[in-house]
């Protein structure tokens, strides 16, 4: 019974404190905006590769010089470099956000839950030794009589002496 209390206390201390939630939410939103900026650039680059290969190359070269770690700084630099392309990235990024964000919460929770189950299963298998059957060395397998041996095989083996 004491173990359950200890586990319960550990779980409650591992949860984020309510005052941390706004900061975590802001950081997550910022990271998602940066990622959607990156995805918008990828979509546009792929479109340009089909219609304007030189434009796709220029976007690729520009993107190699600027980090997507800060999507807003990337976008500001792109707007200074090529206003039309910057506006296009903003439009595509907004479109992606409008269409993906509805599904994101439940997809994220489902993927995290599934991944956690798989990690826990692998850990349990590793701790209990149930994950992998130990394989027998080849010499042991060849020294044992086969279950599929026929009576003729047994009589042939005894006459070989």
Swiss-Prot record:
Region ranges (Disordered): 1-20, 130-161
Highest taxon in the source lineage: Bacteria
A GO term, aspect molecular function: protein folding chaperone
Keywords: Bacterial microcompartment, Carbon dioxide fixation, Carboxysome, Chaperone, Cytoplasm, Photosynthesis
An example Gene Ontology biological process: ribulose bisphosphate carboxylase complex assembly
GO terms for cellular component: carboxysome; cytoplasm
Cell compartments where the protein resides: Carboxysome; Cytoplasm
Positions with biased composition (Polar residues): 147-161
Protein family per UniProt: Belongs to the RbcX family.
Role played: An RbcL-specific chaperone. The central cleft of the RbcX homodimer (RbcX2) binds the C-terminus of an RbcL monomer, stabilizing the C-terminus and probably preventing its reassociation with chaperonin GroEL-ES. At the same time the peripheral region of RbcX2 binds a second RbcL monomer, bridging the RbcL homodimers in the correct orientation. The RbcX2(2)-bound RbcL dimers then assemble into the RbcL8 core (RbcL8-(RbcX2)8). RbcS binding triggers the release of RbcX2.
Subunit field text: Homodimer. Interacts with the exposed C-terminal peptide of endogenous RbcL ('Lys-460-Asp-470') via its central cleft, as well as C-terminal peptides from other cyanobacterial RbcL. Contacts a second RbcL monomer via its peripheral polar surface.
Domain comment (free text): The homodimer has 2 functional domains, a central cleft essential for production of soluble RbcL in which the RbcL peptide binds, and a polar surface which plays a role in correct RbcL subunit arrangement.
Official protein name in the record: RuBisCO chaperone RbcX
Organism expressing this protein natively: Synechococcus sp. (strain ATCC 27144 / PCC 6301 / SAUG 1402/1)
Gene name of the record: rbcX
């Amino acid at each position: 019974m004491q173990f359950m209390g200890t586990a319960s206390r550990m779980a409650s201390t591992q949860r984020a404190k309510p005052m941390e939630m706004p900061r975590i939410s802001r950081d997550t939103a910022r990271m998602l905006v940066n990622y959607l900026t990156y995805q918008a650039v990828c979509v546009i680059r792929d479109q340009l590769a089909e219609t304007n290969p030189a434009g796709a190359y220029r976007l690729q070269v520009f993107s190699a010089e600027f980090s997507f770690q800060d999507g807003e700084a990337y976008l500001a630099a792109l707007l200074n470099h090529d206003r039309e392309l910057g506006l296009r990235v903003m439009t595509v990024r907004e479109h992606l956000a409008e269409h993906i964000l509805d599904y994101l919460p439940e997809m994220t929770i489902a993927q995290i839950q599934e991944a956690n189950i798989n990690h826990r299963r692998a850990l349990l298998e590793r701790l209990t030794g149930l994950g992998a059957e130990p394989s027998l060395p080849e010499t042991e397998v060849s020294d044992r009589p086969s279950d599929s041996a026929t009576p003729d095989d047994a009589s042939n083996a005894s006459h070989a002496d």
